[in-house]
């Protein structure tokens, strides 16, 4: 008798994706982040659902409803901080996942990669609208500053901004629609993640060597399920430690002050995971130029498959490319630090240098280095 998991229409799909999936035998822990992102998404949807049961998307009561969740709802503070810090964990896993793809040449699977970039954009949009919901000072001013960037679009900019706001400033209508977006987007992310997996399973996973592994595959279960469970336990431990010992470590104290349109905070800055893009935005003195650079900082990822000039897929045996990759990581960390600093002399210049280096590395230096490495292979 054939096993039900191989014949049942629904079970068959799950079986082919998570049980009998042929997987390369040599994939490292860097391949854990895909499943960790799935775990993060489920955690965020569940905690978010419980928060939505008590939250009111109205300018007069939003802030106090969040306070009510923390003070009066049973374990509401745990749910709220799991959700807030879960977002940080989500982005740590996202950036590690993208970094893994860059290092090992996973971007050669173009459909999977491009859907991944769209997913990154969608998660960033979700995090942004979600940050507005507590209606603190940084929520309000962050929403004002970022939505205002659309006014840089020639001719239709101002109309577009007012259309997004639902009025002439960030107000009741803006908060209500942002709550609606924040509720619907995670389900769109869930659907996109399934398409991401669908395309990945068409080709099979890449591996650290960047070579075909069809002759050496092992079933996903039990080998990688157990490995993923270890990763999941580490992620949950980190999230719980952060939530229970330092829940406000990554947040902004300004968001504990209710939104006040008449008082601008001294330093408007987004959450830590957007600081690198914020630094790139600020490094260009022109408004439209800044917006273009901001978009390109993520969109440039879509160009990477076309900029792959190496004869080898992975960076494992390409020391010069490895060096540039780690320079890129250091550059992004520098941009993250600068994004959180005030707009003053040394930081502005450093930000401009780091932003230039970011685009230079991806668009020029890395493809050129790959060509040089190709030549060195012949020597």
From Swiss-Prot:
Q: Binding positions for a ubiquinone? A: 201
Recorded hits in SUPFAM superfamilies, A to Z, give: a domain/subunit of cytochrome bc1 complex (Ubiquinol-cytochrome c reductase), Transmembrane di-heme cytochromes
Q: Which domain of life is it from?
A: Eukaryota
The family database entries (InterPro entries) matched by this protein are listed as: Cyt_b/b6_C (IPR005798), Cyt_b/b6_C_sf (IPR036150), Cyt_b/b6_N (IPR005797), Cytb/b6-like_sf (IPR027387), Cytochrome_b (IPR030689), Cytochrome_b_C_euk/bac (IPR048260), Cytochrome_b_N_euk/bac (IPR048259), Di-haem_cyt_TM (IPR016174)
Q: Which UniProt keywords apply?
A: Electron transport, Heme, Iron, Membrane, Metal-binding, Mitochondrion, Mitochondrion inner membrane, Respiratory chain, Transmembrane, Transmembrane helix, Transport, Ubiquinone
What is the UniProt remark on how the cofactor binds and its stoichiometry? Answer: Binds 2 heme b groups non-covalently.
- PANTHER family from the entry? CYTOCHROME B
Q: How does it assemble?
A: The cytochrome bc1 complex contains 11 subunits: 3 respiratory subunits (MT-CYB, CYC1 and UQCRFS1), 2 core proteins (UQCRC1 and UQCRC2) and 6 low-molecular weight proteins (UQCRH/QCR6, UQCRB/QCR7, UQCRQ/QCR8, UQCR10/QCR9, UQCR11/QCR10 and a cleavage product of UQCRFS1). This cytochrome bc1 complex then forms a dimer.
Spell out the protein name for this chain: Cytochrome b
Record the organism. Answer: Kogia sima
Q: What is the lineage of its organism?
A: Eukaryota, Metazoa, Chordata, Craniata, Vertebrata
């Amino acid at each position: 008798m054939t096993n039900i998991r191989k014949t049942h229409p629904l079970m068959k799909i799950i079986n082919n994706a998570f049980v009998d999936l042929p997987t390369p035998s040599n994939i490292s822990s860097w391949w854990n982040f895909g499943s960790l992102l799935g775990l993060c998404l489920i955690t965020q949807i569940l905690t978010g659902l419980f928060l939505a049961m008590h939250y009111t998307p109205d300018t007069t009561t939003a802030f106090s409803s969040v306070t009510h969740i923390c003070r009066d709802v049973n374990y509401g503070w745990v749910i709220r901080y799991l959700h807030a810090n879960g977002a940080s964990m989500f982005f740590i896993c996202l950036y590690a996942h993208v970094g893994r793809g860059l290092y090992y040449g996973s971007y050669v699977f173009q459909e999977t990669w491009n859907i991944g970039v769209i997913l990154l954009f969608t998660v960033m949009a979700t995090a942004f609208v979600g940050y507005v919901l507590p209606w603190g000072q940084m929520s309000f001013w962050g929403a004002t500053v970022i939505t205002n960037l659309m006014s840089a679009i020639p001719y239709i900019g101002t109309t577009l901004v007012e259309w997004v706001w639902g009025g002439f400033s960030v107000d009741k209508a803006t908060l209500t629609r942002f709550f609606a977006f924040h509720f619907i987007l995670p389900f769109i992310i869930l659907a996109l993640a399934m398409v991401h997996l669908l395309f990945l399973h068409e080709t099979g996973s890449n591996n650290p060597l960047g070579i075909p592994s069809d002759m050496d595959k092992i079933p996903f279960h039990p080998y990688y399920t157990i490995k993923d469970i270890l990763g999941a336990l580490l992620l949950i431990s980190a999230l719980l430690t952060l939530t229970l010992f330092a829940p406000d470590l990554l947040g902004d104290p300004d968001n504990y002050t209710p939104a006040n349109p008449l008082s601008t905070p001294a330093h408007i800055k987004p959450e830590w995971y957007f600081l690198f893009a914020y630094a790139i935005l600020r490094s260009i003195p022109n408004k439209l130029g800044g917006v273009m650079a901001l978009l390109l900082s993520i969109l440039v990822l879509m160009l990477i498959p076309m900029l792959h000039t190496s004869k080898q897929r992975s960076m494992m045996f390409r020391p010069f490319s490895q060096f540039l990759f780690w320079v890129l990581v250091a550059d992004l960390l520098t941009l993250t630090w600068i994004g959180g600093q005030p707009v003053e002399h040394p930081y502005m210049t450093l930000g401009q240098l780091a932003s230039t280096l970011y685009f230079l590395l991806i668009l020029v230096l890395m493809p050129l280095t790959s060509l040089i490495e190709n030549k060195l292979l012949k020597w």
